[in-house]
Structure formats: C-alpha cells, structure tokens
Amino acid sequence: MRTLTVDLDDRSYPIFIGSGIRQQKALFDDAIHGKQVMIVTNETIAPLYLESMVSMLSVDYKVDTCILPDGEVYKTLETYGMIMSALLEAKHNRTTTVIALGGGVVGDMAGFAAATYQRGVPFIQVPTTLLSQVDSSVGGKTGVNHPLGKNMIGAFYQPQAVIIDTETLQSLPQRELSAGMAEVIKYGLICDVPFFDWLEQEMPELMALDNDKISEAIYRSCLAKANVVAQDEREGGIRAILNLGHTFGHAIETEMGYGNWLHGEAVAAGSMLAIDLSWRMGNLTEQDICRTVALFQAANLPVLPPAEMTVECFVERMALDKKVLDGSLRLVLLGALGDAIVTSDFPMEDFNSCLLDALEASKQASLA
C-alpha cells in the first residue's frame, strides 16, 4: 500500500492506494466520526462491493445505505435530494460519516450532501473508477450539474480520507478506463514531462491493468493533484491548471447531453483543442502535437470534438465557465509541454480557426 497526504493544515487528509484495501477496516476506523455511517453508492457498484463493506463496518457502526441510479444524467439536485432524504429518514445526526463508494458522480454528490447535511458532516471517498481515483475524489470539489452548465451547484469540502482500491478497476468497462486515462495524461501535459514520457512507454500495460503500473500512474497523478491543491485549495490561482481541456470539454458534455460523451472523452477532445490553440500561439511544436495525439489514441480516446457542434455552441457554453473573470473567457493552455498557463490573452482569430478546423476534421472523419 502507498500513502500520500493532501496538505491543508488542520484539514489535511491521507490518500491510500493499494489492491484490496477497501476491506482494511482500520483505514475506515481512523476516518469515521461517531457511530453512524451512510454508504452512498449506485446501482452498478452496489452488487459488486456494497454487501462486503456493510458487513465489515456493521461490527462497530450503525450502517445505512443509499443506492442511486447510475450515470452523469442523474447528477442533479433531485438525486442529491435522495441522499438527504436517506440521511433524515434514518435519523443520522451531526456525528454521522458519509462514505462515497463509486465513481465521480457518486463522489461529487455524496460529498455535496456531506457538505450540506446539518451544515456539514465528515465523509470518506472510496473511488471505484480510474477517473475518480486520479481526479474527482481528491481536492474537495463536490456538487451537481444544472441543465445550463456542469458542476454549477456545489461546494469545496474536503474528505477525511481517500481509499483507492485498484482491485475495483478490474470490473471497469474499457470505455470508462479510457475516460479515466484522459485525466492521467493531463497531469503529464500540465506539470510533469517525465510522467508524460513514462506514459508513452507504458500505455499498453496500463490499458491492460498491470497492477504495479496502474498503481504507479494513480500515485503520480494523485501526487501532482495534491501538490497543486495544497497551494490553492479554492482555485483562486494555480489550481485552475488542473482544468486543461475542461472548458472546451464541459461545453461538449453540456451540448451533447450529460453522459453521451463521458467526462474523460470530452476532456481528451477539449485538451487537444487547447493544445492546438497553444501551438497556433507558438508555444508548442508539431512534434508535441503528434505525441499528444498518439498518446490519447493509444488510450482509445477521441482527439476531435463532436461533428454536430459549431463554434457558436462552444462560445455560448464556454461563456458560463467558472473561470470567466469580468466577462473575459480564461483558458488553460500550455506555455510548453509540462507547463500549463491560465490566460485570457489569446488571439480570437486563432481561437476561432482552431475550433473551425477541428470541427471540419471531425465532419470529414464522420463521413469516412
């Protein structure tokens, strides 16, 4: 088992990474407050892992469960209300601990419920998808979607611990594994060129879920995110670099309908748009572009946006991005490979031509 810490002074917490560790009760005992536990999961994960976790924790705690429908389309205030109702109906008090057992949607909603139930109760993240293990479970972002925009309703609220069991990846559909790999690749692009180089060499074994290699990828991803979050918990500055590809990507997810494009797929296509724009601004070489395209494709990820979208769709959706400041759109771009920047200083001509060219290439590809 490997351990690292998200250093946030009195709100610091550990991240545990290992195979089979969801069954190590001591990890939970150290993070549970009081004697009540609410496990929030979904209909896909419940048959796989819920019974064993309830059995393990019921020895010392009153354990209740809340099983949600599965999918990004259910990341709504209505589903969040199901968690609140479950807590109230089972008479959970302020000393209860919420456990999020599932992927990013479960973690975001359970975390938001914990942040707001009786003005805040502790929670533990037990992420079961690669995307949630390397990204959404770490850093304290919680919330739900709105029809007009992704993650528009939420809170910053840190967990007591993140328990990453790599064994759960064995049940992950290939498409979900690829989606998670988009966030892994992102860390190499924004801040860690040696990691990017390593991913180029190891991607076939990572996609085959070699345990040592996937554990290393998760550890290095979490370490990169923990270092950024420790510097800027609430995204007032450097933390925004973690959103490479997300401004374009969220526009894709919202426009195409939540769940039709997985988050990681949208991030991959969005990252390529950001990288193309960075290249047009003279920050990257053609070799950088080719290497990045090849790496995303090795992970079975899209490198072009949906052919159905238009420049106008992107502009309208991106205007609601949380990084917009005083009416100006700010993008996460690359100053160089491994060096992300957040800027509103980009030529609109390059921005428009980047989108137009990518959309045209996507249309041509769809006709081929």
Curated annotation (Swiss-Prot):
CDD domains, per the entry: DHQS
Catalysed conversion reaction: 7-phospho-2-dehydro-3-deoxy-D-arabino-heptonate = 3-dehydroquinate + phosphate
Keywords in alphabetical order: Amino-acid biosynthesis, Aromatic amino acid biosynthesis, Cobalt, Cytoplasm, Lyase, Metal-binding, NAD, Nucleotide-binding, Zinc
Cofactor note: Binds 1 divalent metal cation per subunit. Can use either Co(2+) or Zn(2+).
Record flagged with keyword Cytoplasm: yes
Subcellular location: Cytoplasm
Its EC number(s): 4.2.3.4
Record-level GO BP terms: amino acid biosynthetic process; aromatic amino acid family biosynthetic process; chorismate biosynthetic process
Named cofactor requirement(s): Co(2+); Zn(2+); NAD(+)
Record: residues binding Zn(2+): E183, H246, H263
Described purpose of this protein according to its UniProt entry: Catalyzes the conversion of 3-deoxy-D-arabino-heptulosonate 7-phosphate (DAHP) to dehydroquinate (DHQ).
Protein name (record): 3-dehydroquinate synthase
